[in-house]
Amino acid sequence: MIPDPRDIILAPVISEKSYGLLEENQYTFLVRPGSNKTEIKIAVEKIFGVKVTNVNTINRQGKRKRTRTGYGKRKDTKRAIVTLSPESKPIEIFGGPAA
């Protein structure tokens, strides 16, 4: 059973690299760490109504942070770089490519 698409896509990634990828019709999202590429593709197509051609994923290890009592660790995250088909409409969640 595929979970709700909004449980898979957590948030868009706002960074210099993700804004640069907008011109290549690629969008970067923070996704649930247990999700696979097929689930991510289906979720993006359902939420935004676009056609996805490719999904690349990145597993990022959480940073080690010092606390008052010793060391802790931020949680691990997973990012997905989603490539849309050329005839697909752009996703307006990022505000479009920077001009």
Swiss-Prot record:
Disulfide bonding pattern of the chain: none
GO biological-process terms attached to the record: translation
Keywords for the protein's UniProt record, in alphabetical order: Ribonucleoprotein, Ribosomal protein, RNA-binding, rRNA-binding
Entry GO CC: ribonucleoprotein complex; ribosome
Gene3D superfamilies tied to this protein: 3.30.70.330
Function per UniProt: One of the early assembly proteins it binds 23S rRNA. One of the proteins that surrounds the polypeptide exit tunnel on the outside of the ribosome. Forms the main docking site for trigger factor binding to the ribosome.
Record text on subunit structure and interactions: Part of the 50S ribosomal subunit. Contacts protein L29, and trigger factor when it is bound to the ribosome.
NCBIfam families: PRK05738.2-4, PRK05738.2-5
Protein name: Large ribosomal subunit protein uL23
Species in which this protein is naturally found: Saccharopolyspora erythraea (strain ATCC 11635 / DSM 40517 / JCM 4748 / NBRC 13426 / NCIMB 8594 / NRRL 2338)
Phylogenetic placement of the source organism: Bacteria, Bacillati, Actinomycetota, Actinomycetes, Pseudonocardiales
